[in-house]
C-alpha cells in the first residue's frame, strides 16, 4: 500500500470544504476526514475516497450499489468489513453530492 499524496489530500479537503470545520488526520493507511471532531470519511491510497456508514445509512449505501471495504485476514482467512463505502464516481465530480452524502453519514454517527 502506498502513502496518499498531497494531491489526494487536497482533492478530498476541497471536495468536502462546504461542510466547514473540516480537519484531517493520517491513519489506517490513509487520511481520515472529520467534521466538528467526528470522522465521516477517509481517503485510502488503494481505494480512494470512502464515506463512513453507520445505522440505517449502511443500508442506503448498499442499496446504491457502492463498493464496501472488506478484507481477509491472512493469518486466519476470515473476512471482515470496515464501515466505509467508496463514493460514487458522480460524487467525486460534484462537491454538492459528496457533501450531501457526508451530511447523511454524519446524521447517523
Residue ranges and their predicted role:
Residues 1-109:
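Charge-dense, helix-prone N-terminal extensions
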Amino acid at each position: 500500500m502506498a502513502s496518499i499524496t498531497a494531491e489526494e489530500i487536497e482533492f478530498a479537503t476541497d471536495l468536502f470544504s462546504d461542510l466547514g470545520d473540516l480537519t484531517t488526520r493520517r491513519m489506517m493507511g490513509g487520511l481520515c476526514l472529520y467534521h466538528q471532531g467526528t470522522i465521516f470519511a477517509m481517503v485510502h491510497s488503494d481505494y480512494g475516497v470512502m464515506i463512513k456508514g453507520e445505522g440505517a445509512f449502511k443500508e442506503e449505501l448498499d442499496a446504491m450499489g457502492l463498493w464496501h471495504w472488506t478484507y481477509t485476514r491472512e493469518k486466519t482467512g476470515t473476512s471482515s468489513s470496515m464501515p466505509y463505502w467508496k463514493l460514487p464516481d458522480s460524487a467525486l465530480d460534484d462537491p454538492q453530492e459528496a457533501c450531501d452524502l457526508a451530511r447523511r453519514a454524519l446524521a447517523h454517527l
